[in-house]
Each structure stands twice: as C-alpha cells, then as structure tokens.
Amino acid sequence: MPIGYIITILIIGVCTFTALIRVTRFGILAFYLTMVINEIPHLAALLLVFSTVLALSEGDLHGLLGSVLLIVAGLEFVGLLELTRRATRARSVVASTAADHGVQISNDAAQSWIRPLVFPVPLRPGAVKRIGRLPYGDHPRQRLDVYRHRNGDLFGPILVYFHGDGYSSGSNRNEGRVLLHRLAVQGWTCISATYRLRPDAGFTDHLDEARTVLRWARDNSEIHGGDVTRIVMAGSSAGAHMTALTALAPPNSAEAVPRIAAAVCLYPWIGRYFGRGEDESQPSTPLALDPSTAPPIFIAHGDHDSWVPVEEARALYDHIRTGSPNTTWYVELPGAQHAFDALFSWRNAAVVEGIVAFLRPIGEGTELTDSYR
C-alpha cells in the first residue's frame, strides 16, 4: 500500500476541498488549512503531479486501490485548477475597480505573473534597505522597521503599516511585505510597526500606539526620510481595524497627531473591541464613527475569508462611501482567504498594484523606479 502517496493526496485533498467552499463554521481551522494552498495552488498541483508520477513509476498504483487513488488525484487536480483560476482573476477584479475610478494598474508581467509563478516568497529586493527594530516606546513590542530605497535622495510619501492577528499575536515581518517593498522601491519611506498585545494592553493602548508611531514618523523624517505632509496609514485584519478607526476619527489638534492623507484596509475586522458593548464611551468600531472627515480609503477583502467574514468589509465600505466626500475603493477578491498578503502570489501582486494605483495622486512628484531591483 502506497502510504506516502495516500498521505500526500489526503493532505492536498482536504486543503483543496476546504479552499473551494465558503466555510462558515470552524473558520480558524479552515484558515490554517487553506491559507497557503489558496495562494499557490499551482505549486500544490505540481507536487500532486510529481507524487503521482513517482507512485506510478514505482508500481504502487495497481489494482482497485490504485484506480481509486488516481481518480481522487484527478479530482484534486481539477480543484487546484479552479483555485488557480480564482487567484488569477484577482487582477481583472482590481483592474475593473481601478477603471471605475478612472485609473489603470501596471502591466508589469514579470511582477504580476512570472514572479508569483516561479518564486512566490516575498524577499526584500536589493534596491530596498531595512532599518530594523527601532524603538518608539519602552515596551519590547513597541518596535518598528523602516524600509527605504538605497538611494537616499528619494523623498516620497510615508506609509505606516500595522499587522493583524486579533491584537493577541502577530509580527510586522509576516504580512504586507510585498506592499512595503513595492512602495519603498518607488521612493516611499515605509514603516511597519509592532504593538503591545492583549490582555496586557487594551483598546486605548493600541490607539495610543498607532498615534505614537504616526508622530514618530513625523518627528524622525529628517533621519529616515519621507514627506510628513503625505502620510498614509495601512493595516491588515486588526491592523486594518486600527487604521479605519484612525482614519475616521475627527481631527483633534490637542493630540498633535499627523493627519493621514489616505488609508489602506486589508481584510479588515470592524467589530467592537473584545469585551466591549454598545454602552462603550469611546467607540471601538469604525461603524460608530462619522465618515464625513475620512480621507481616501482602499479596502480589499476575500469572499472566502473564514476568519473575518466578507460582510464586515462590505459594511465598512457602505458606511464610508455614503458619508465621505473622498474616494473609497472596494475590491472583493474571488476565493481569497484571510492573510492573502503573506506571499508574493498572483492575488497579492494584483492587490498591491491596485493600492499603488490608488495612491498615485499622493505619490505624484516622487521619483519612481520602474520595477523591483
């Protein structure tokens, strides 16, 4: 009995089937089963083909059991083709949203198609340097990385990014790296920060840290670069929750916090903070804030997100666009799970190009480079 082959197709089969359907129960388990295979299904298909050819060459797939295993492998291959189709559709969805706003996204085939096909690992390009683990506070979690072009003469806008993971875990070196690298190549100063986690820190602590990082970006611009009049805040999941709250908060000159020029929310969670109810004195959901002073906002979410349902992003988009005088982009990605920005995948590359197009008015006047180097 080909035990190794059976284990291979069992793992691929469970992950593929779970990724194909929209899971509404056991969402966190579904996320861990599908996060990787959903972004690089072509590599899973390659593994499946290689394993099948190897099993055939060794004579392991004979008799009734062998026939059944081949049929199962064939069905899994078809499922992986469907996941690939959904992943590659992201580019047309992003391009359509951009066109609705009178903008075109980049047609760089090397970065949009070839790189995700052959090497989906989000390594930092040679043109970008990272200055790491800089403190913005006394706590060990109050650290940030700065990403800049190695040509120190470039003077672009500033992006401040916050990671997700439910305010309870996470790292600033797992998510958003493709976006950080992409903008840094274009001359932006990109800051990716960690923050204290619950239960040791609470809602007001997180917001205070977000404001502290924004002030740090302004106060250290002469050292690390960046135009303090063009600061963009971004985040994923819990980081997007923090970003949306900051973007929709009314201006408060007493806090001396730089006003952000735009916001980027990737697979945002928008609920009330843990343990809070409707009687909270300070709103912890962006849906309770007036969007009339909101800057331009970009929202992207997957319709197969099993950790944070896509309905949350739709609600945030509807809330903002009905009250904000500025543009609001919403990209709903077919088949996408939570944390789709962890790899340099077709889907993530498309979203990043959409963000670059969305931020183009803010980046005008910045000396740009044509591609990753």
Positions of predicted regions on the chain:
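Primarily recognizes the serine-hydrolase "nucleophile elbow" in alpha/beta-hydrolase
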Residues: T212-Q282
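Conserved alpha/beta-hydrolase "acid-adjacent" motif
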Residues: S306-A315
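Short amphipathic alpha-helix adjacent to the substrate-entry channel of hydrolases
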Residues: R173-I191
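Short beta-strand element of the alpha/beta-hydrolase
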Residues: F155-G166
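N-terminal cap/lid segment of alpha/beta-hydrolase-fold proteins
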Residues: F17, R25, L29-S57, L61, ...
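Short beta-strand/loop motif that positions the catalytic acidic residue
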Residues: T293, I299-H301, D305
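C-terminal catalytic histidine-bearing segment of alpha/beta-hydrolase fold enzymes
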Residues: P2-I28, M35-S51, R314, G323-R373
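Serine-hydrolase catalytic-loop signature spanning alpha/beta hydrolases and amidase-signature enzymes
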Residues: G166-S169, N174, C190, W216
